[in-house]
Amino acid sequence: MKWFEDFYSDARYGLRQLRSNPLLTTVCVLTLALGIGANTAVFSAIYLVLLRPLPFKDADRLVLVTEYNPGNVAKTGSPLLRYQTRAAQNTVFEETAAYWDVSGGNGLVFGGAGSAERLQFSVVTNSFFSILGEHPSMGRSFSQSDELPGGGKVFLASDALWHRLLGGDLQAIGKTYRLDGEPYTLIGVLPPDFHFPSACDVWLPIGMLGTWPLQDRVSHQFWMLGRLRPEATLARAQAELNGIQEQLARAFPTTDANWHVHVQPLLEEFVGNVRISLWVLFGAVGFVLLIACTNVINLLLARAVAREKEFAIRAALGSARQRLVRQALTETFLVVAGGTALALVLAKVGLSAIVALSAGSIPRFEQPHLSGMVFSFSVALALLTTLLVGVAPGLHAVDCNSSESLQVGHRSGSASRRTTTLRNALVVCEISLTLLLLSGACLMLRSFQQLREVDPGFLPEHLVTVKIALPDALYPKTEQRAAFLHELLRSLNSTPGVQLAAASDRLPLSGEGNWGGINVLGRPVLDSAHAPSVEGRGVSANYFSAMGIPLLRGRVFTEDEVAEGRHVAVINKMMADQFWPGADAIGQRVVSPYHPENVSEIIGVVGNVKDFALDAQAPPEMYSPYGWWNTMNLVLRGSSDSASLVSAVHSEVAALDKEVPVYEVKRMEDLVSHSMERQRFELVLLALFAMVALLLAAVGVYGLLAFVVNRRTHEIGLRIALGAHPRNVLALVMTQGMKLVLFGLGTGVVSSLMLMRLMSGLLYRVSSTDPLSLGAVTVLLAIIGALACFMPARRAMRVDPMTALRCE
């Protein structure tokens, strides 16, 4: 194994060389550890979120089928009848299933008086678990009989619920528990690692809904899952389901026309809109590694220049060129190996920091760890870095002229023109890359500032929200829910410390929506498939005052209108402008295609509210008197602290009904802040990478000029001895350094104008070519570059001529 003996020999010699210059070795190892560690941490995040397969059977063949209505609804589920037709007529799926994640709109109350707790739940077909390849860890799954209307009242529980509320009782299977006041039998417990839909506590069979889903073609609750056959493709599935949808549109034009099908990998539903963000961050951290590599290359080149005489002697004694290159690469490999070992430690810390910074805004970040794939990436990155960093010093080792280097008068450390050009080019490159990163960070900062200045349409200060869930069995009618709410709000509004108490079925910026079609009386009547959609919210009479939503025209609801459930409506400005441009909306009457018997009169227009995101346009929205849902959001504006307000809610709810749980306590200011978590995450990481790049670039410029000054000490001393003023020496070195800085800034500006367009999707109200951002970072980098040039230049102007000449 001669190659191993040679490598061992080179490694021993390389270690001795590295130990002989501990400062340079330490700087190189730390620089590479920073670059490789940051890349490993970000790649680990990308792998966890984007590349890691879903924990389901044949995850790469699982797809999600959704619907959209052009111009009205971007993405929603399907009526159960439509799902059943697609499931029966398709030829591309091995198996299909449907689920309805009900948690967003309704609560499921577990337990009884004094121990009630609201649970998140989903209604699923009996094939739901089999298509995912999941089986209960205890008990059984749903059967076909459970799917029949009026089937047995049974449920499956999550492992977390089984431990939390049932105490991990092995005898719990087969026992009956109260869900929404009605008895349900627990038939199984799912494995601890099963979380779909996310955070679900309970799964119910579709039969518990009764017969209404089999008679309804307008409610879009059910999301369809399909497992593609091995020979089927996504495009083929899309085409086939398009054909089935066209048949449904012809058969049921009033309900199924104007609806389109979208087929996507199930992974896309988990990933959401973070794909672009993570790849941009990966590109940014890749730039950091390149900058780190340029610094290390420059350091190793300086070391190679200083060792020219050593390499010349070895060449003169018969060492082959490839042996010299191998020696240089081996030393580089040892440096990179040390950097990689430290990088894995930094990556572990960095990944934990990334998870903490994401604050729940990035999906699939549960149990973050460095997987085998991440270790493989680190090894590959280390090998690539070795080649990238080691080639230039290795080539320089065999490129030096042996006879010239061995001459008595030859100055050790005098670099060739090609080496000097390469080192200058590397500095220009890192200045350019640093400008790119700083530009991206500045754009994100400007975008985040714009986002923070957005008016959400309400006043979040001193607002606290809590949810309550009324059991369906105890409050089956709208009138009962409205009566409970009316009495609760009356009590809360008379509680000390509470200025205003109100209620709504959905809160702004909560991610919850409830769209529906609307027809205007006096205009052509459109069916549910073609009627324009608006967001609908049920609210109490003083909701607008409590939230601080301004009334623009007309009036808001009275207590009597809410209590009696009168058909009146308040709309936002967006709906008024969209439906009645240039006209008065007050007094207009609207009706839903789903309930043509309920005609509502518009009595007021209020300001727009950001319902889904601060950077999204407010949708047309219609408010109605509250009373439809069993889940209520209480909104309390008070002068006291939030804990006192929440305590008051607990007391008043318990006084009315101890079986009603109180949960999800939030401050509206926190809700607004949380809506910006993803943008804050992107900004902090990008800014951090930019600061690291700025530091490395400054060190790179300083290191190059320090090397130049050290190499030209004799020349500088001679100039001063012959009468050159120290200021001239300062100008000479500063000019040499600033030429590189300015050239790097120029190439960086051009690169930024071209590459920053890739960030357009991440920016809000800021152009990717924003001149203010680009100008600010250019000036900043020029100042930092000038400071980095000044320190070695000042050292040059203080060179003692006699000392310099004696040293030579």
Annotate each PLM feature:
Residues A292-V336, V699-V741, L745, R795, ...:
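Interfacial "coupling" helices/loops that link adjacent transmembrane helices in transporter permeases
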Residues N21-V49, P53, I291-T294, V336-A341, ...:
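Short, strongly hydrophobic transmembrane alpha-helices
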Residues S44-A45, I297, F333-S405, R446, ...:
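Small-residue-rich transmembrane alpha-helices
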Residues M1-T25, L266-V271, L299-R326, T330, ...:
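Alpha-helical transmembrane segments of integral membrane proteins
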Residues L34-R61, Y68, G350-A359, L433-H462, ...:
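Alpha-helical transmembrane segments
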Residues M1-L24, F56-K57, N72, S115, ...:
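Membrane-helix entry/capping segments
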